[in-house]
């Protein structure tokens, strides 16, 4: 074997064997070693390329390194591997492990070199010392790539990394996993996994997954999961992490990757995926996962089915379908299944089904197959509470005690709520006392339910007495006993020491509420003060005091608080105060919601401030707050009659907006207002307005919305141009209203200076006379001719017969008589169906002059 010489700079003096010629190598001073590279050779070492995308610069550097290395290496025929092994060990001791890897790679490239013998002769202790030295300097990347390179020549990397080095690696990997370097960390861990290292010991897997979720990189998280032994568990963690973030795209990417990695569907992953669909509100995808399992003839377990029913609990029909299919698949329901079914019935308000499910669960409990828990009893009690079936709720409480299940705080809250919803304040108080006697600590919800029951029963004084006693008020504290108001009532204040039996705070220290304040810490919430605000009635100043007290406790008023305060002003007719509070919400940093705006609009409408009400409506639309049904209905009912075309157009625009938003307006109320406005056209002629109602039977069963939409369409058109009235499909009553509405619009536009420049064309229909629709069109035509000619004295001609009357500004009486005769003959003989009618411009002008 030939020997070779490598020219390195080193602080260690390497002595050749005695049969070699002695060479002297210049060494760098000790002080320079800390600031400069260890050798001139290492300056030429390229930086390690990235594993997946080596840069062109690194490739060229590697090429130049090879050419340089061939220049400094020459083989010596009588050399031995002991020298080079000793040389590599000395380099490792100096921490120059990359140079050691370069020697090993060069030996491996020489066909005559015994690489295995070289690997056995290297001092592993010195090499391990060099690796540890690099790790202490934070060179984790250099260490990993060096281990990969020397592994190719037979040096086992696991033998070089001791416990102290593992601790150093763990420290650096944890720092990288919690930063933007998580991708580099996973690249290095993939290399170490290939070398046999246990990746789980290097870093907390959950930290890596968290970092991948933060940078929205599901592929990177999947790569890391494949390095660990229990891949399925970490895959579930990945899916759940992206689900909590609401990133459904990354969730689906991770799920599809799971299906590629795993041979068969994993129930744990399927369950996690269904739960995540619920978190993201995409319940449809949860159904697809379940259906895919059934298509593959895979029976889902009880946990998958329970998750599916829970995610779809808002859909009673689908949940019951899954439950029945579970029985077909012979999957035994557990207690969680029944709890979810009860929850579904509660959301759907199906008390009957909840009773049946509860009885079935009780039957299975008596058979020893199930054990009902507190959640089951609490859920069924809530079902009865929402349905105001308080007797059934109390019966369930007795069932609980009979089987030894102790009611918890949530159970007591549901029981108190059941009586409160039914208006049984005394029974609710009795349950609260029973709760205290059992040693169960009430939460804020229990207190709030009891306060709400008092307020709903108009027991406002009692609500404030309870509130003050729960706060642990002293009997010597000055409280206003009569400064509590009912709706529309305000009383003068009296000091507590002068109070009689009706004072705010009972002096009896044995009261269970006083005892509760001593035993438990009652912390009022924003909801507590919202309830008390309702008890203030119209006393704005009392409500303002409560708001100030709430703020002093560090509680922030929410939208309900502000809306209640606005309504308080409305009760006293203070429109300006209500609007001022609405403006204060903006300055306080609380964005008004639809309830706040609707409350203010309602106050304006009730006090006949319609301009301000419509202004607030436009303002809420500018803030992109969607009106609800109450908002639209309040505005449509704000007027008892219409006075101008602008008002009609305004309300019709709101009507159309309401229908487009999916709400059903009160068509009959709006129709009556439009009828009154339209019939105003002929009031001056002394005609009765009962003409429409006389024939109301003709419109039986027809939607009123069709008429209103027709009116709204024509109200939006300009009358200055050529106007056509389309009456196709309308009855004679509806056609009458539309024509009157257009004439009213023409009149008001004329009063503002708009001149009629053309005839008005009325389109009736195109059907034949022997059809049902054709006969209806004839009836409509006759009714319109009678309205326009007899009641309004307008000239009506069949379209195309304009030449019968000369185009003049005035029509004499003879011409009027001729026209009447023509129309009368045409109506009587009916030689043909008149599809269109025309009201002449001249007669319209005369009619407008008379009206003016």
Swiss-Prot record:
Lineage: superkingdom: Eukaryota
UniProt keyword terms in alphabetical order: Chloroplast, Plastid, Repeat, Transit peptide
Localization in the cell: Plastid, Chloroplast
Any one GO molecular-function label of the UniProt entry: mRNA binding
A GO term from the CC aspect: chloroplast
Transit peptide: 1-25
Major localisation: plastid
UniProt PPR repeat ranges: 334-364, 373-407, 408-442, 443-477, 525-557, 558-592, 593-627, 628-665
Family from the record: Belongs to the PPR family. P subfamily.
PANTHER family noted in UniProt: OS03G0856100 PROTEIN (PTHR47447), OS12G0638900 PROTEIN (PTHR47447:SF17)
Name under which the protein is recorded: Pentatricopeptide repeat-containing protein At5g02830, chloroplastic
The species this protein was found in: Arabidopsis thaliana (Mouse-ear cress)
């Amino acid at each position: 074997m030939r020997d070779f010489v490598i020219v390195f700079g080193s602080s260690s003096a390497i002595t050749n064997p005695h049969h070699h010629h002695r060479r002297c190598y210049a060494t760098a001073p000790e002080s320079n070693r800390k600031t400069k590279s260890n050798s001139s050779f290492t300056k030429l070492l390229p930086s390690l390329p990235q594993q997946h995308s080596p840069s062109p610069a690194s490739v060229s550097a590697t090429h130049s390194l090879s050419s340089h290395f061939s220049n400094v290496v020459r083989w010596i025929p009588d050399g031995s591997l002991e020298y080079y092994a000793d040389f590599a060990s000395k380099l490792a001791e100096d921490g120059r492990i990359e140079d050691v890897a370069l020697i090993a790679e060069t030996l491996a490239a020489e066909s005559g070199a015994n690489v295995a013998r070289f690997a056995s002769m290297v001092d592993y202790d010195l090499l391990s010392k060099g690796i540890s030295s690099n790790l202490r300097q934070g060179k984790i990347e250099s260490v990993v790539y060096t281990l990969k390179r020397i592994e190719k020549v037979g040096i086992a990397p696991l033998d070089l990394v001791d416990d102290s080095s593992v601790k150093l690696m763990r420290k650096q990997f944890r720092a990288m996993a919690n930063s933007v370097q998580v991708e580099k960390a996973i690249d290095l861990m993939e290399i170490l996994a290939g070398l046999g290292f246990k990746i789980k010991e290097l870093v907390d897997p959950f930290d890596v997954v968290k970092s991948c979720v933060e940078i929205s990189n599901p592929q990177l998280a999947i790569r890391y999961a494949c390095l660990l032994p229990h891949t399925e568990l970490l895959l579930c963690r990945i899916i759940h992490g992206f689900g909590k973030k609401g990133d459904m795209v990354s969730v689906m990417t991770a799920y599809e990757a799971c299906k590629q990695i795993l041979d068969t569907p994993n129930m744990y992953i399927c369950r996690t995926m269904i739960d995540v669909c619920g978190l993201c509100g995409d319940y449809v995808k949860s159904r697809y996962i379940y259906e895919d399992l059934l298509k593959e003839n895979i029976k889902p377990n009880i946990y998958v089915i329970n998750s599916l029913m829970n995610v779809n609990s808002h859909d009673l029909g689908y949940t019951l379908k899954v439950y029945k299919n579970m029985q077909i698949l012979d999957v035994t329901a557990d207690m969680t299944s029944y709890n979810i079914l009860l929850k579904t019935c509660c959301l759907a308000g199906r008390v009957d089904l909840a009773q049946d499910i509860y009885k079935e669960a009780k039957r299975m409990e008596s058979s020893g197959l199930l054990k009902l828990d507190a959640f089951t009893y609490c859920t069924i009690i809530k079902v009865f509470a929402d349905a105001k079936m308080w007797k059934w709720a109390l019966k369930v409480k007795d069932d609980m005690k009979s089987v030894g299940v102790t009611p918890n705080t949530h159970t007591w809250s549901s029981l108190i709520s059941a009586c409160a919803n039914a208006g049984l304040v005394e029974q609710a108080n009795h349950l609260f006392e029973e709760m205290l006697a059992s040693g169960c600590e009430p939460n804020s919800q229990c207190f709030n339910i009891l306060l709400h029951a008092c307020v709903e029963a108009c027991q406002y004084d009692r609500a404030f007495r309870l509130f003050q006693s729960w706060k642990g008020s002293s009997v010597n504290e000055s409280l206003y006993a009569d400064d509590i108001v009912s709706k529309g009532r305000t009383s003068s204040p009296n000091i507590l020491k002068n109070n009689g039996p009706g004072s705010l705070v009972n002096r009896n220290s044995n009261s269970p509420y006083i005892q509760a304040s001593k035993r438990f810490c009652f912390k009022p919430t924003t909801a507590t003060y919202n309830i008390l605000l309702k008890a203030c009635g119209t006393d704005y100043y009392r409500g303002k005091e409560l708001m100030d007290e709430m703020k002093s406790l560090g509680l922030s008023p929410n939208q309900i608080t502000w809306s209640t305060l606005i309504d308080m002003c409305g009760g006293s007719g203070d429109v300006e105060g209500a609007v001022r509070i609405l403006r204060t919400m903006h300055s306080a940093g609380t964005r008004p919601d639809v309830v706040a705006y609707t409350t203010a609009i309602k106050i304006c409408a009730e006090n006949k401030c319609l301009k301000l009400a419509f202004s607030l409506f436009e303002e809420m639309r500018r803030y992109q707050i969607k009106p609800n049904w109450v908002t639209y209905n309040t505005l449509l009912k704000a007027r008892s009659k219409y006075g101008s075309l602008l008002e009609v157009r305004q309300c019709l625009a709101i009507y159309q907006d309401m229908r487009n938003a999916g709400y059903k307006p009160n068509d009959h109320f709006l129709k009556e207002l439009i009828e009154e406005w339209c019939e105003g056209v002929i009031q001056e002629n002394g005609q009765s307005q009962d003409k429409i109602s006389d024939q109301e039977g003709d419109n039986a069963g027809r939607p009123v919305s069709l008429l209103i939409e027709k009116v709204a369409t024509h109200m939006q058109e300009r009358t200055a141009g050529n106007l056509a009235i389309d009456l196709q499909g309308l009855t004679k009553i509806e056609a009458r209203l539309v024509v009157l509405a257009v004439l009213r619009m023409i009149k008001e536009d004329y009063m503002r200076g708009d001149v009629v420049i053309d005839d008005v064309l009325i389109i009736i229909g195109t059907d034949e006379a022997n059809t049902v629709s054709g006969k209806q069109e004839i009836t409509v035509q006759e009714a319109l001719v009678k309205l326009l000619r007899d009641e309004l004295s307008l000239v009506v001609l069949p379209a195309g017969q304009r030449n019968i009357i000369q185009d003049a500004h005035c029509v004499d009486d003879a011409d009027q008589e001729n026209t009447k005769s023509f129309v009368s003959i045409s109506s009587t003989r009916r030689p043909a169906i008149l599809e269109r009618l025309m009201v002449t411009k001249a007669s319209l002008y005369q009619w407008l002059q008379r009206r003016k």
